[in-house]
Design a protein with these regions (language model features):
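Hydrophobic/small/kink-forming positions within alpha-helical transmembrane segments
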Residues: 27, 52, 56-60, 82-87, ...
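Loop-to-transmembrane alpha-helix entry segments
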Residues: 78, 94-114, 118-121, 147, ...
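Residues that define the loop-to-transmembrane-helix transition and helix capping
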Residues: 12, 72, 98, 175-179, ...
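Hydrophobic core positions of alpha-helical segments in small-molecule transporters
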Residues: 16-17, 50, 77-80, 100-103, ...
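Selected transmembrane alpha-helices and immediately adjacent juxtamembrane segments
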Residues: 144-170
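Alpha-helical transmembrane segments of compact multi-pass small-molecule transporters, enriched
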Residues: 21-25, 77-91, 103-106, 187-191, ...
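Membrane-interface interhelical linkers
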Residues: 1-49, 59-68, 119-152, 173, ...
Length: 287
């Protein structure tokens, strides 16, 4: 997403193309296709509609929250939502959580706060004026306005999205995940097309073919990362998978920002990365 800013790509159009290539990759790699009648009869069909909508809904929430509450607050709200699928693993799915793993999850939350919240705040991101107009109302309030409602919605929205993914995985049974994931991204694509059409009709943006280039890489990466997460759900409990996954994403993002974008890591970031390693070890230890 940082590359979208560097090359001045339209966020909504690049996001739409991301869903085009994510869905396309899934359909090209799946082993079999459902007919329309078979698709509607799938036990995961209804949940996949909700999940596809939820993908793009949480994105709009995050862009609006970035405008109103700032990047740091938004990122923290998103990553700390790992608490919800972890609790759902215990309450809804009957998973067991021992003391060592619990301590690991607590350390994981501390690590997330340090890695995401301990960044140098001297640089502010460029925010497009057409981002989530219905939510943000083009109100560029920046870091100073700590609006609590949107970050709270991000927290519950992102956590709910993770739970929806687990529920769809359970409904899928032993079938190949490719077609289901491709269909979820296809639903997100339909909503993305509506958003881009709205921007173009209202004159909020102009059509950019170059946005497709940004969507190619992001879409293929998103599809395969989602495919890996869905298949990991078959091997690991929520209480292990989601904390480790979120720590991994945040750590890789921090290191990528340092290597590619010359971001300065503070001592809090380094401490957070060290704690993250300890947290992963504790969470994955067998009781």
């Amino acid at each position: 997403m940082r590359l979208f800013e560097r090359f001045h790509l339209d966020n909504h159009q690049a996001l739409m193309w991301n869903y085009v290539f994510a869905a396309g990759t899934g359909f090209l790699t799946c082993k079999q296709f459902d007919t329309p009648a078979q698709l509607v009869a799938e036990p995961w069909f209804g949940l996949s509609l909700i999940t596809g909508f939820w993908f793009i809904f949480t994105y709009l929430l995050m862009t609006a929250s970035t405008q109103r509450s700032g990047v740091t607050v938004t990122s923290l709200s998103s990553k700390l939502s790992v608490v919800l699928p972890t609790l759902a693993g215990v309450v809804l799915f009957g998973e067991r959580l021992n003391f060592v793993a619990t301590m690991g999850i607590v350390l994981a939350l501390v690590a997330l706060v340090l890695v995401v919240g301990g960044k140098n705040k001297s640089a502010s991101p460029r925010i497009d004026s057409n981002i989530a107009p219905a939510l943000a109302r083009n109100d560029m309030r920046g870091e100073a306005n700590k609006n609590w409602l949107l970050p709270l919605l991000i927290f519950f929205g992102t956590g709910t999205g993770d739970i929806l993914m687990k529920l769809t995985e359970q409904r899928n049974g032993a079938d190949d995940m490719s077609f289901m994931i491709a269909f979820i991204y296809f639903i997100a694509l339909l909503f993305g097309i509506l958003i881009v059409a709205y921007d173009l009709i209202r004159g909020r943006s102009k059509w950019q073919w170059k946005s497709a280039l940004g969507g190619i890489g992001l879409g293929v990466i998103n599809y395969f990362s989602t495919y890996c997460v869905y298949n990991a759900m078959r091997c690991f409990d929520n209480v292990v998978l989601f904390p480790v996954y979120n720590i991994g994403v945040v750590s890789v993002t921090a290191l990528t920002g340092w290597l590619l974008f010359k971001e300065i890591l503070t001592w809090k970031n380094y401490l957070g990365l060290a704690i993250a390693i300890i947290a992963v070890i504790l969470i994955t230890l067998k009781p």
